Swiss-Prot record:
PANTHER family, alphabetized: 30S RIBOSOMAL PROTEIN S20, SMALL RIBOSOMAL SUBUNIT PROTEIN BS20C
Keywords recorded for this protein, A-Z: Ribonucleoprotein, Ribosomal protein, RNA-binding, rRNA-binding
GO molecular function: small ribosomal subunit rRNA binding; structural constituent of ribosome
Annotated Pfam families: Ribosomal_S20p (PF01649)
GO CC annotation terms, alphabetical: small ribosomal subunit
Stated name of the protein: Small ribosomal subunit protein bS20
Length: 87
């Protein structure tokens, strides 16, 4: 356990940020799964709608620093490619 006041504060701050990041990542994963399920079922309408929701969540996560912007772009690109592959 830290003895220095600033170190104690950093521990609290890290715990708070870790919790926030987990919530955001969990939401993104859920939305990505919705897109993947819709693609697997070849449901173009649901996949497109789910893709929009997922893109918004991924971009927000990237702007908050949860994901690196290139990581977010890669996730969005792969999802869009999957949705566009539906005939």
């Amino acid at each position: 356990m830290a003895n220095i006041k600033s170190a104690k504060k950093r521990i609290k701050v890290i715990e708070t940020k870790t919790l926030r990041n987990k919530v955001i990542k969990s939401k993104v994963k859920t939305l990505v799964k919705k897109v993947e399920v819709a693609v697997a079922a070849s449901d173009k309408d649901l996949a497109t709608k789910s893709l929009k929701d997922a893109v918004v969540a991924i971009d927000k996560a990237a702007s908050k620093g949860v994901y690196h912007k290139k990581n977010a772009a890669r996730k969005v690109g792969r999802l869009a490619k999957a949705v566009n592959s539906i005939a």
